[in-house]
Amino acid sequence: MYAENYKRFLELIEKLREFEGALIVEGLRDEVALRNLGVRAEIIRLSRLPLAEIALIASRYREVMILTDFDRKGEELAKKLVSYLEGYPCRVDVETRRELKRIAKKDIKGVEELYGLYMKVVSVSDPQLEGFQ
């Protein structure tokens, strides 16, 4: 990750921590990584149920964030989820995933690796990052 992206990466992690809706991830390792980052929001794992059921559960929340992996499969899952959620009144956030992918795709392939990357970023002693650690 380029040094100029460190601050934005940490801002996105803070956004995840403060998120109050439902986060949709692919599996248990993704959920564990997010919990390690301090995320307290409801986390729904795709590995447990069909997409239509996931969408129905997620639709009960005012806001839903899709946080699938950054590979082709994750991209396809995100698109399918967006289409399943279109008929529901919840707000769907895919921008956070897109921005994380843009910033971190050279370093990680998916959500389960976010915590490791976070630890690397906060270990960098940069005065501009003060207050984010």
Swiss-Prot record:
Keywords, in A-Z order: Magnesium, Metal-binding
Pfam families, sorted: Toprim
Cited InterPro entries: TOPRIM_dom, TOPRIM_RNase_M5-like, UPF0292
Cofactor(s) the record lists: Mg(2+)
GO molecular function terms attached to this record: metal ion binding
CDD domains xref list: TOPRIM_RNase_M5_like
Keyword Metal-binding: yes
Cofactor binding, per record: Binds two Mg(2+) per subunit.
Protein family according to the UniProt entry: Belongs to the UPF0292 family.
Protein name: UPF0292 protein TGAM_1777
Species the sequence originates in: Thermococcus gammatolerans (strain DSM 15229 / JCM 11827 / EJ3)
